Amino acid sequence: MVNTMVIRKRYEGQLNELFKDIRTLGLHTYSMIDQSIRVLTDSQITHAREIINNDKKINKLEFDINEKVVMLITKQQPMAKDLRLMMSTLKIASEFERMADNAANIAKIRTRAKFTDKYLVMRLETMGRLALLMLKDLNDAAKNDDLDLVKEIIDRDNDIDDLYKQIVNSTYLIDNDPFVSGQAHLVARYLERIGDHIVNISEHIYYFITGERYESYNN
């Protein structure tokens, strides 16, 4: 009986450590996205390079989470809900890592292009701020098992999609430069993809809470 309690306590400690890791990964990813938006109007390219280098830390965090989940599944043989939690954690970690990649790609673009069109920058910044707000609210939804907020966050991705379409469907040349226009469209695409990854995380959280896929709910 004592051994069982010790094993259970150790297992719960490992789960808590996993929670901390995924929160840390989320915070670092949030910070990278925030910095990538700021660097669009930053005159110092060195800041963009710092973001690019930080992507390696995100990759390491995701790798460590994957290793811990595999170890827990192998050694503990978790029950259904815990297994669902671990599989969701794996997928969420992957989504965070991809978001960080997109943020790093935005920073890379800043090292080769400068955007002076205020209207363009405003729309790009708005896309980024909408994504950051979705991430912030998603953290609250996960902590409180708030399914209504999860669904609302998924719906809010439409606002990012609309801004993306406005940018890529613009007929005028940004700064009268085809290269700059192309780079701006890429930034918008990366921000749109960040929104998509947030939607994916929302659906993983919905699945963990309910045991059902979000698509099943909609149908």
Residues covered by each model-derived region:
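Cytosolic, long alpha-helical scaffolding segments
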Residues: 1-219
